[in-house]
Amino acid sequence: MNGRNNDMGRNGGADYDDRDFGRTPDLNADAPGRRRTGRKRVCRYCADKALVIDYKDPQALKYFISERGKVVPRRISGNCARHQRKVTLSIKRARNIALLPFTVTA
């Protein structure tokens, strides 16, 4: 017959379940589509009006750069959209005048 090994049975291999491969079903998983909501992060620049986003201050901008050299997203940094745009622009300006590196070497 067609040269194929027909050992899978009639179900096309559906005779297996998760226990056959050492995987156990996650009984504590949340319902599908439900997200965990943590505490709302407050934008540090909205909370303290004295703080200024300045591209000439690389120590303040390093907080918003990941270990790999990428800009940290809003959901992690806690910035509002307005200040996240300003932080991103400041990081780009600081990189262009060599105050911050474009890449991080390991």
From Swiss-Prot:
Q: In its UniProt record, which GO terms are filed under biological process?
A: translation
A cellular component annotation (GO) from this entry: cytosolic small ribosomal subunit
Give me the segments passing through the membrane. none
Cytoplasm is among the record's keywords: no
Taxonomy, superkingdom: Bacteria
GO molecular-function annotation terms?
Answer: small ribosomal subunit rRNA binding; structural constituent of ribosome
Disordered: annotated span: 1-39
Alphabetical list of PANTHER family matching this protein? 30S RIBOSOMAL PROTEIN S18, SMALL RIBOSOMAL SUBUNIT PROTEIN BS18M
Name the HAMAP family on file.
Ribosomal_bS18
Q: What does this protein do?
A: Binds as a heterodimer with protein bS6 to the central domain of the 16S rRNA, where it helps stabilize the platform of the 30S subunit.
Annotated protein name in UniProt: Small ribosomal subunit protein bS18
